[in-house]
From Swiss-Prot:
Its cofactor is Mg(2+). Binds 1 Mg(2+) ion per subunit. The magnesium is bound as Mg-PRPP. One of its GO terms (molecular function) is GTP binding. Pfam families: UPRTase. Pathway: Pyrimidine metabolism; UMP biosynthesis via salvage pathway; UMP from uracil: step 1/1. It catalyses: UMP + diphosphate = 5-phospho-alpha-D-ribose 1-diphosphate + uracil. Its EC number is 2.4.2.9. Transmembrane segments: none annotated. It is an enzyme of class 2 (transferase). One of its GO terms (biological process) is UMP salvage. This is Uracil phosphoribosyltransferase.
Length: 208
């Protein structure tokens, strides 16, 4: 599995701001989208382009445009919605596919409860977004579903990843790519990432 920890100064600065204990919902939400945007920039660097001729201001001109496969953004509910706008900033025509999964707080296992994938999802590059890769269960379950539906090119974008989650994801799906702003130290006994960001879903939506 290709793992890219994006170490751009802006990414490191913004993810550092997100770790503040008393950060406001508004600020956390803004930063989640901003870091999601920067991760998207890195994750799409290998998209193929083709030369096409368009009508410019002074006659025909050759330009490069994205060729071939289109993109679907796959936010894992609910926290993944906080990164979606950052992805769409760069790919506004992307289709949106939604997967609902929550983590059982006792077993730490993923529990699927909703899915709505876009048409022709099997012909698209899937960008799966979720702020936290802790145990990896939700991401693995989502990618399982996408592969069952025929997706062949899948990239995961997460704000923060734990080594345990990375190991589990690599074992389950060694053929995908993952982009993260930070690989953190470890999981605690409750399955939360240390130092982490806290509960990203609660911070994005202002709930507890």
């Amino acid at each position: 599995m290709k793992v890219v920890e994006v170490k751009h100064p802006l990414v490191r600065h913004k993810i550092g701001l997100m770790r503040e204990a008393d950060i406001s919902t508004k600020r956390f939400r803004e930063l989640a989208a901003e870091v999601g945007s920067l991760l998207t920039y890195e994750a799409t660097a290998d998209l193929e382009t083709e030369t096409v001729t368009i009508e410019g201001w002074n006659g025909p001109v050759q330009v490069e445009q994205i060729k071939g496969k289109k993109v679907t953004v796959v936010p894992i509910l609910r926290a993944g919605l906080g990164m979606m706008d950052g992805v769409l900033e760069h790919i506004p025509s992307a289709r949106i596919s939604v997967v609902g999964i929550y983590r059982d707080e006792e077993t730490l296992e993923p529990v699927p409860y909703f899915e709505k994938l876009c048409s022709q999802v099997d012909e698209r590059i899937a960008l799966v977004v979720d702020p936290m890769l802790a145990t990896g269960g939700s991401m693995i379950s989502t990618i399982d579903l996408l592969k069952q539906r025929g997706c062949k090119q899948i990239k995961a974008l997460v704000l923060v990843a734990a080594p345990e989650g990375l190991a589990a994801l690599e074992k389950a799906h060694p053929d995908i790519e993952l982009y993260t702003a930070s690989i953190d130290r470890c999981l605690n006994e409750n399955g939360y990432i240390l130092p982490g960001l806290g509960d990203a879903g609660d911070k994005i939506f202002g709930t507890k």
